[in-house]
């Protein structure tokens, strides 16, 4: 056994589990395509100040959780991306995409990195899928993004999820609320834990994110943000809720929901799963109209998006029994060789089948026919193709259906035509055995 181990907070994903990942990714690609979203891929690291400006210097992510280093002699720090929205917005601005079209719908499935305490559904290297609508953040746009996220869950068969939603108002609303919240919490500062006391000075809204039951009891009677909203922000939120009602999307208004990133404004939302325990958030998002200006744009750019934790989604699906039917697809054909002297014939048949678009495996270890049949069954092959002396002489090979045990004798070309007709049309190449 090797002395080397995966780094703490990371894990290897082997082929059996990859099958579930590929299934989920396939559903994501299909559903978001129905809404007109296109995939974007950004660098895995960005300049550190991008995240400091966008996420917020007082957040736990920037303060404690980023993997940063200085690769260049000029000493400018770069960071492995802890989230995707800032990088997507940076790419959008750098490429001046708004000049080509006012609205861009982008999505991603990406690896992210945070220095968190490893636990179930929370690793230091993790995956998210998410979507960003850049150039629009109207109530209809917000409702569409939420609807698409929920449709992914529905298409995967996930049940029991709860959508929590709130409005953060505009900047002036949040400043008034921040002052009122601080005034309420300061007399209770002795009841706050160390992280909350630090947040009280820097950004008291972060305290509302606390999962500590003692802190939650303190903030239960705190002022509510909705009491500080201006009429326009309140009306806009009501319109979002109306569109969600029209789409039959159930939700719970949570006045304490603020999300963990400073760039959010107006509508914010979160989806929680009862299968995840105390850390129950499976995904969330909201509006972030001011992010573009923070990153150098001359004006705000309407924007709304979300992100979903892939590992947390997998845990939820596993606990709901939704992954049992997902098994690795085996080869269409497994070639069973009678003896090593016939290997060249078997290799030729294998090449022809593969070049005809038929997934084919064969023994490369010199095992007995019995062992080869066990391997064919272990790999969940559909058919076994027998290559023996009599088959080579007659050019009629035994093709056994491993599901029904039915067996026919066919030439390779006949075999290709039969197998291809049940999958997709392919050209039968010339050359090799007939």
From Swiss-Prot:
PROSITE patterns: AA_TRNA_LIGASE_II
Example of a GO biological process term: histidyl-tRNA aminoacylation
Gene: hisS
Subcellular location: Cytoplasm
This protein's UniProt keywords: Aminoacyl-tRNA synthetase, ATP-binding, Cytoplasm, Ligase, Nucleotide-binding, Protein biosynthesis
Native species: Chlorobium phaeobacteroides (strain BS1)
Catalytic activity, reaction form: tRNA(His) + L-histidine + ATP = L-histidyl-tRNA(His) + AMP + diphosphate + H(+)
Pfam families attached to this UniProt entry: HGTP_anticodon, tRNA-synt_His
Domain of life, per lineage: Bacteria
Main location: cytoplasm
Protein name, UniProt field: Histidine--tRNA ligase
PANTHER family: HISTIDINE--TRNA LIGASE, MITOCHONDRIAL-RELATED, HISTIDYL-TRNA SYNTHETASE
SUPFAM superfamilies referenced in this protein's UniProt entry, alphabetically: Class II aaRS ABD-related (SSF52954), Class II aaRS and biotin synthetases (SSF55681)
Cysteine pairs bridged by disulfides in the record: none
Enzyme Commission code(s) on record: 6.1.1.21
GO molecular function terms noted in the UniProt entry: ATP binding; histidine-tRNA ligase activity
Cellular component per GO, a single term: cytoplasm
Gene3D superfamilies, per database record: Anticodon-binding domain (3.40.50.800), Bira Bifunctional Protein, Domain 2 (3.30.930.10)
The family this protein is said to belong to: Belongs to the class-II aminoacyl-tRNA synthetase family.
Keyword GTP-binding: no
NCBIfam families assigned to the protein according to its UniProt record, in alphabetical order: hisS (TIGR00442)
Self-association and partners: Homodimer.
């Amino acid at each position: 056994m090797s002395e080397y181990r995966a780094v703490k907070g990371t894990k290897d994903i082997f082929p059996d589990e990859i099958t579930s990942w590929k299934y989920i990714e396939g559903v994501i690609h299909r559903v978001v395509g129905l809404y007109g979203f296109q995939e974007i891929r950004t660098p895995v690291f960005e300049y550190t100040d991008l995240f400091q400006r966008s996420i917020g210097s007082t957040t736990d992510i920037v303060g404690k959780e980023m993997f940063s280093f200085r690769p260049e002699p000029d000493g400018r720090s770069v960071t492995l991306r802890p989230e995707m929205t800032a990088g997507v917005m940076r790419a959008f601005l750098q490429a001046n995409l708004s000049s080509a079209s006012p609205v861009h719908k982008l999505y991603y499935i990406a690896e992210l990195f945070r220095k968190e305490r490893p636990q179930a559904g929370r690793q230091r290297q993790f995956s998210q899928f998410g979507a960003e609508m850049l150039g629009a953040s109207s109530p209809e746009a917000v409702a569409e993004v939420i609807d698409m996220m929920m449709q992914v869950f529905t298409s995967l068969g996930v049940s029991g999820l709860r959508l929590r939603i709130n409005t953060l108002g505009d900047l002036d609303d949040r400043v008034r609320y921040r002052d009122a919240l601080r005034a309420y919490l300061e007399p209770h500062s002795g009841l706050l834990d160390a992280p909350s006391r630090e947040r009280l000075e820097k950004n008291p809204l972060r305290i509302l994110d606390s999962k500590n039951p003692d802190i939650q009891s303190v903030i239960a009677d705190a002022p509510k943000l909705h009491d500080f909203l201006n009429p326009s922000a309140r009306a806009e939120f009501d319109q979002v809720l109306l569109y969600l009602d029209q789409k039959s999307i159930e939700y719970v208004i949570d006045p304490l929901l603020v999300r963990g990133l400073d760039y959010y404004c107006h509508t914010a939302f979160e989806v929680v799963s009862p299968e995840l325990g105390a850390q129950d958030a499976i995904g969330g998002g909201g509006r972030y109209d001011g992010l573009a200006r923070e990153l150098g744009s001359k004006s705000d750019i309407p924007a709304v998006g979300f992100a979903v934790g892939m590992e947390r989604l997998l845990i939820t699906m596993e606990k709901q029994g939704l992954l049992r039917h997902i098994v690795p697809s085996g080869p269409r054909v497994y070639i069973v060789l009678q003896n090593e002297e016939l290997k060249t014939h078997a290799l030729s048949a294998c090449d022809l089948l593969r070049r005809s678009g038929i997934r084919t495996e064969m023994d490369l270890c010199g095992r007995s026919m019995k062992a080869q049949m066990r391997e064919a069954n272990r790999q969940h092959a559909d058919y076994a193709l027998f290559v023996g002396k009599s088959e080579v002489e007659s050019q009629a090979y035994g093709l056994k259906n491993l599901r029904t045990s039915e067996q026919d004798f066919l030439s390779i070309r006949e075999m290709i035509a039969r197998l291809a007709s049940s999958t997709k049309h392919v050209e039968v190449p010339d050359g090799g055995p007939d």
